[in-house]
Amino acid sequence: MDVIQRIITLDRRSKGFYIITNDLVKKLPELKSFSSGTVNFFIQHTSAALTINENWDADTRADMNDILDKIVPESAGYRHTAEGLDDMPAHVKSSLIGPSLTVPITNGKLSLGTWQDIQLAEFRRQPHSRTIVCTIIGLRSN
C-alpha cells in the first residue's frame, strides 16, 4: 500500500461551478501508477467547495449556482459581513456542499461515471485561487 500527497493550487476564478477534473489529473501524474485505491481531494477554504456533478450540460452548473443563491441569499441579514455581503453566504454554501471528495482509482484512472466530473464550487464574486490537498492511497501496478 502506497500513499502520495500533493498540494495543488487552482487558478483564480470568480463565483460559479467549474469542471476541474483534468486540472487535477494533470497535476497528479502518479495516479497512472496505481492499479486500485482512492484519492481524496480536500479544499483548504471556507468559501468554496468540491462536488461531483454532471459534465455534459453547462446549464447544470449555472442552475446549481442559481439554486444555492435562492437557498442561501445574500440579503438574509447576516451578522458576519466584514469581508463583504457575499462572504457569509459563501461559508454557508461551502458547509452545505462540503470540502472534500473521495474517488476510487481503477487501473490508473479516476473511476467517475460517464457524465460525472469533479467540480470546484466557488462562492465568492471576487476571483480567488484555491488550494486542494490530494491524497492517493492504493496499490501500485507491477
From Swiss-Prot:
Q: Which Pfam families match?
A: UPF0047
GO cellular component terms, alphabetically, are:
cytosol; nucleus
Cystine links in this protein are none
Highest rank taxon of the organism: Eukaryota
Q: SUPFAM superfamilies in the record, alphabetically?
A: YjbQ-like
* Database matches in InterPro entries: UPF0047_YjbQ-like, YjbQ-like_sf
> Which PANTHER family does the record associate with it?
UNCHARACTERIZED PROTEIN YJBQ-RELATED (PTHR30615), UPF0047 PROTEIN C4A8.02C (PTHR30615:SF8)
Task: Extract the NCBIfam families matched here.
Answer: TIGR00149_YjbQ (TIGR00149)
- Family, similarity comment: Belongs to the UPF0047 family.
Q: What is this protein called?
A: UPF0047 protein C4A8.02c
Q: Which organism is it from?
A: Schizosaccharomyces pombe (strain 972 / ATCC 24843) (Fission yeast)
